[in-house]
Amino acid sequence: VFTRRKSKEAEPSTSTGTQIRRFELEDLDVGMKAIARDAYGSPTVLERRDIDKPEIGDAEMLVRVHAAGVDRGVWHVMAGLPYPIRLAGYGLRAPKNPVIGSDVAGVVETVGNDVTRFQPGDEVFGIGKGTFAEYACALEDKLAPKPTKLTFEQAAAVSISGLTALQGLRDHGRVKPGQKVLVIGASGGVGTFAVQIAKAFGAQVTGVCSTTKVDLVRSIGADHVIDYTREDFAEGEQRYDLILDIGGNSSLSRLRHVLTSKGTLVIAGGETEGRWLGGTDRQIRALLLSPFVGQKLGTFVCSENHEDMIVLKDLIEAGKLTPVIDRTFSLSEVPEAIRYLEEGHARGKVVITLEHNDRI
């Protein structure tokens, strides 16, 4: 929105004997461009708008967005499905925040009174609120300095997918050097990080993906790659110490069949059409069964925190982790980007890029 503030009065003109009022350009509040919606639904509910910049709290920062990542969580928040998403604070009947998007990379514009780690001008990456916009609000504890070797587009691809992979393997999978790890969904956003992080921890990694993505998974370090269109991982003789299931929908019995007797299964994904559970029924069954078997079966919710963002940053700067970007889209193309991801085309991450010199 363009808002004209009260004009400032100029000195009287001596040449005409009349007073002149002039408007100064700096008194125009430009606002920002954003992709917003008023209702839950498909990508058709999204539209480009001129809106006010977000206001920040004492522990927050205003970030000028250079790039924003797209992940499955974006689709869930956009659609309001499964329904528990709405109960988690996103709005019961209509979305509370019209702008979606979480992954962000950009430059700090302003900081709140309690912010100590960052100052205006710092390049950062992490997790914000409403990042499909020219400016986004973010908590200090959910950002980290952008790795110098990454572009803004690469940095925007890291946070949510990288944290999910890191915590799934390290905290819930307890991965150790020499273990055999199976990553199901190895070519996706989380999967491409998981393969590299498991290798960084010294594991022997097998990735599961489709035919067209085999070369990609092999190129990022997988020791073995299973093309699920030609081979069923559950029918082989190999047993795994840890399975990270990101994109699959295999039954618990099939997954347990290829686990060692004391192995660990971590479910971090898998979608169904259910409007209430949306695939989480499998996670729930795993949690209920785990106490009664020798194997550890479970799931988790990613923790968005500064400390683990620094771990990812260190892995990147050590050359052990590189974001895999499939395609980039402009801010105006956010609906197309979400459709592309939803249809399963992505090899790695999908990223939204913003050019601030071009007002879209």
Residue ranges and their predicted role:
Residues 52-69, 83-130:
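Glycine-rich beta-strand-centered segment in the early N-terminal region that forms part
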Residues 123, 180, 263-264:
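Short glycine-centered segments of the SAM/dcSAM-binding site in methyltransferase folds
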Residues 235-242:
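A short acidic, Gly/Pro-enriched loop at the edge of an enzyme's catalytic core
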Residues 2-4, 19-30, 303-360:
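C-terminal hydrophobic helical "lid"/dimerization subdomain
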Residues 246-321, 354-360:
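Glycine-rich phosphate-binding loop and adjacent beta-alpha segment
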Residues 155-227:
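Mid-domain Rossmann-like dinucleotide-binding core that forms the NAD(H)/NADP(H) cofactor-binding site
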Residues 128-140:
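A structural motif shared across PLP-dependent enzymes of the aminotransferase-like
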